[in-house]
Amino acid sequence: MTQYQWQLAPQPAAADEHALSETLGVPPFLATLLLQRGINDQADYDAFVHPDTSRLHDPFALHDMDKAVARILKAIEQNEKITIYGDYDVDGLTSSAIMLETLQSLGADPDVFIPDRFTDGYGPNAEVYAYLQKTGTQLVITVDNGVAGAAVIDPAQAAGMDVVVTDHHELPAKLPHAVAVVHPRHPDGDYPFGDLSGAGVAFKVATALLGEPPLESVDLAALGTIADLVSLTDENRVIAQLGLKMIQTQPRVGLAAILKEAGVAPETVNETTVGFVIGPRLNALGRMGDANPGVTLLTTFEDDVAAELAEQVGKLNQERQGLVAKIAQEALTMAQAPENQAAKTLLLASKGWHEGVVGIVASKVVEATGKPTLIMNIADDGETAKGSGRSIEAYHLFKALEPAKEHMVHFGGHHMAVGLTAKTTDLPSIHAQMEAAAATMLKTVPKPTLPISTRLEDADLTLDHYQLIRQLAPFGQGNPEPVFSVRPQVIQNVKQIGKENNHLRFQIDQGINVIGFGYGDAAETLATAQAVKLAVQLDQNTWQGHTSLQLMLKDYEVKQPQVIDWRMPTIDGGQFKASRTYVFFDAKVKQQFERQFSFGGPTTIAAQVQAPLANAVLVDLPKDAAALHQVMQYVQPPVAVMFYGAPSRLVAIPTRAEFGAVLRFLKAHPGFDKHHIPAIAKAVHLTVHQVILAVQVFFELDFVTIEGAFISPVTAPAKKPLQTAKAYAARTAFLDLAQQLQTMPRAQLETMLLTEHSDSEVES
């Protein structure tokens, strides 16, 4: 069943969707996606789809940018020693590379210092700053760090080493007294976009220093922006679009080497490539050891240097993947302990867990359990533990843990992620605070939500439509890749794939392939399912030069049949033994069956059902669609259906000749007693029901009169088509409905009967 709580995004008004679809010449579902993103007209669309540096904000709108630029230019002019102090993740490495290239282009020769994750830690380090000052550094420019470093920066500044802070992380209560603090959310600033990455801030500083956006570095800014999971909206979208285009068409030497080592063609690079190919490789440097080679790899012009470093990061990434798999398995086993299953949050700690990958492991545990999680490595001496936490949308991890800061040696982070160091004896207190916060933030442990953009029909599932969706890329925070609900009629060729059969491949309608990573266990369930809802993303697959649409499975729901098929041509009474409520449309049929059979539950007339009714059986045929619709407003699925119709009720409408035979009989027998209709039936070789229908039609068309019990023909009646009689039309509609209800395949019948129910389920 579902791993997620599906959450249908607000759907635009049909009129708005239609208008935008017509204006842009795009399918309605794409108009829905655009409207959900605030794109309401052609101008909005052009601005969203086509990147333009004119949509980048003035860098001097950032607080302290003028001070930062003045101090940096002064250092360059006076040939001061400058050190760029970066960070060991992708955002930090790309920020450092941007600042390095910018200062070099202005004639400076700065040093770059990337702290060691394990010995220096994140952000300003007092020993490192003292070393920098001792070795002659006169200006430190922090990139992707520093805003929380007042305890280190203030003494350094007071001792004569100037610091310019450029950062984007959570703002602490006390900011450092640096020469400048350039931050998009500075409390004294009013920059129009607060969600720049560290690389984005470095790019803005570079723009201010150079007088124009350094487009030669926009690829680096895009890498940091995408990898750091900041919102891909506003100018971040422009940076990401321009940067990805540069990587696709003119990749720098180091990135070309990474892509070659990974077997990825540059022209296919997109945000997914950054997230799953480039990003993990660069991050592996800092996670597994020294990240400084990352800056060299990103800035070198030498092919052999790039190739050697790319091979190194590839091997480190493989090693990192092995560690993650091992630790994640151990952590998930611990999560199954009774005390952890009962908890709303998890704090899992052990010796021997590599500190460089605990954040990734935490993400995997959150994904598997839906619980905010801290993964802590206990030092060899058992005294301290260091780790990372990841969270879910409903639980602000930083705020949850902030009251427990007194129990931590180091602590920092934001809504969805934190890093901390603490004494092992304080871990129970920290977890207790997590649980206390969960009591208010999380009433229950919810399934993680899966936003559904809209529902797609079979006709929407085309390669051309996938290409249209890609126009909305790059996808990420603030611009999520659309997930769609689809309801295939066919699930076939279900097969487990992968070395451990932990993935899945199957086909749906039109032979479209669906790939489900991590869904290998669902093979049997999907192969035998009668009704399935899929949550998917559209993708493409190229094999032997042929490109086709494929769907990526994000979740699925196997529905129990909402219509239980008890239809059969004869009734023997065995169908009525179940403890259900038996609903009849025809009171005469109800009376007849009650005389013939015993029922395991109550019987009722459909017209009398005026409240929700569960466990119902629809026994006979409704007289018309309105009667069926009326009862379906109250019948709760699953509902069993028999739709029995006695053969006498299902005889065909008389032919024109047979109608004529009845009319001639009545003309030959004026004043005929209607109680003797069986005599007419015998004379003209029709059933009694057919003759009754003919008389009703003749009466409605003024071909006969009926006074009391006597039927008399009208002399020289006006000619009227038989089909214009209400009785004729009603009989035709009844027979058509009966044909549908008795012969329609179960799945189609379910759709017909329960559209309202199934729609509300998908949207919930």
Q: Which positions does each model-derived feature cover?
A:
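A short acidic, amphipathic alpha-helical/loop segment
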Residues: 151-155, 361, 593-595, 627-634
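Acidic beta-strand-to-loop metal/phosphate-binding motif
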Residues: 138-145, 614-621, 628
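Short alpha-helices
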Residues: 177-227, 626, 630-634, 638-644, ...
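Extreme N-terminal flexible tails
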Residues: 1-19, 744, 749-754
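Hydrophobic helix-and-loop "lid/oligomerization" segment in the mid-to-C-terminal part
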Residues: 2, 14, 19-139, 159, ...
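Active-site cavity-forming subdomains of large catalytic enzyme subunits
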Residues: 130-208, 216, 233
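Short, ordered loop/turn segments at secondary-structure junctions
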Residues: 87-88, 115-118, 145-146, 168-171, ...
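Acidic, two-metal ion nucleic-acid-processing modules in DNA metabolism proteins
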Residues: 104, 237-306, 310-328, 391-393, ...
